[in-house]
From Swiss-Prot:
GO terms for cellular component: cytoplasm. GO terms for molecular function: ferric iron binding; ferrous iron binding; ferroxidase activity. Belongs to the ferritin family. It catalyses: 4 Fe(2+) + O2 + 4 H(+) = 4 Fe(3+) + 2 H2O. Stores iron in a soluble, non-toxic, readily available form. Important for iron homeostasis. Has ferroxidase activity. Iron is taken up in the ferrous form and deposited as ferric hydroxides after oxidation. The keyword Metal-binding applies. The keyword Cytoplasm applies. The lineage of its organism: Eukaryota, Metazoa, Chordata, Craniata, Vertebrata. This is Ferritin heavy chain A. It comes from Xenopus laevis (African clawed frog). Fe cation 1 binds at residues 24, 59, 62.
Amino acid sequence: MQSQVRQNFHSDCEAAINRMVNMEMYASYVYLSMSYYFDRDDVALHHVAKFFKEQSHEEREHAEKFLKYQNKRGGRVVLQDIKKPERDEWGNTLEATQAALQLEKTVNQALLDLHKLASDKVDAHLCDFLESEYLEEQVKAMKQLGDYITNLKRLGVPQNGMGEYLFDKHTLGESS
């Protein structure tokens, strides 16, 4: 049945939003995997684990925001299978943070592609939604991860295990 509230909401945008929901859920799943990897007794970087768990929750919230938006515009939610993360072992904090930055760049590009699609379909509402709810936050997340990578390298990670411990305790421990 067709929605009675649907207006100027192209089916291509609707389908792309469903794909974004899947991508955000995948990102949440990856961060959850990272979180519980760093929480293991043989890794034991609890602030790193907490940071990645918070990222997982944030990505899930992003997915839910898209789901709510889809309904608000009269679109139909079509959920897809969520792919398993590429890895189960995340190595050291530097490796995981580099993987997280790559993930955020992938999500950011998908958001930019969705914004272009919305712009091409003259969907000002979707453009505004993306600009106000997602794009700035993505840039901030990428900057934060980039800063963390710089500081981890400065501390000598991965060669220096003490550097990883200090990053966990002082950088992420302070933000708790």
